[in-house]
Amino acid sequence: MFLLLLVIVSLAGCAALSGSEPAATPADFQVIGGGFVQRGLTFDHIVSGDAGCDDVNLARTAIGLDARGLDQATPTRLYIYLFRDQATFERLRQSVDSCAGSYATDPGTFESVEASPFVVAGPGPWAPQFRAAIRAAITEAAGSGG
């Protein structure tokens, strides 16, 4: 786990120093994870295919993890849905909200942010800086949205 985190931070650091424009195509989980780390978030208990519910189509796109950092002192489970492209995002986006009923025990505190073709969702409430860091990381990783 430490080695994975070190690789993500190293890659993110190199990208930050390159001064290049954001990618024109969506990035993968390593870039999103690096974006989280660059913005002061930490995460563990990463599970590929963990959509938070029994939706097979979402599970193919999902990664579940526990995250915290900045003003979010208590870890919270996040579900990251990495859709292949804009068309897949549009087709499956509403499924994320339906799936949330499985893990959001209080629908009033369900949180999500999206930047096509990505969605990050989970039980809340999320602290403001934490939410902003998630939004910034996935927006950067989304590039032009696939």
Regions found by a protein language model. Give the residues of each.
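Second-shell loop/turn segments in exported
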Residues: 21-23, 77-82, 117-125
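Short, solvent-exposed recognition patches
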Residues: 30-105
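Bacterial N-terminal signal peptides that target proteins for export
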Residues: 1-2
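C-terminal motif of bacterial Sec signal peptides marking the signal peptidase cleavage site
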Residues: 10-13
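Immediate post-signal-peptide N-terminus of mature secreted/exported proteins
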Residues: 22-32
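A short, solvent-exposed beta-edge/loop patch
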Residues: 100-146
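Bacterial signal peptide processing site
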Residues: 15-18
